[in-house]
Amino acid sequence: DWTYTTWLWWWWWWT
């Protein structure tokens, strides 16, 4: 699921 992957990507990048 690309949305889940994008969410994780944003999360690790933002935090």
UniProtKB/Swiss-Prot annotation:
Subcellular location: Secreted
Keywords assigned: Secreted
A single GO cellular-component term on record: extracellular region
Domain of life: Eukaryota
Keyword Secreted in record: yes
Protein name, per record: Unknown protein 1
Organism of derivation: Ichthyophis tricolor (Three-colored caecilian)
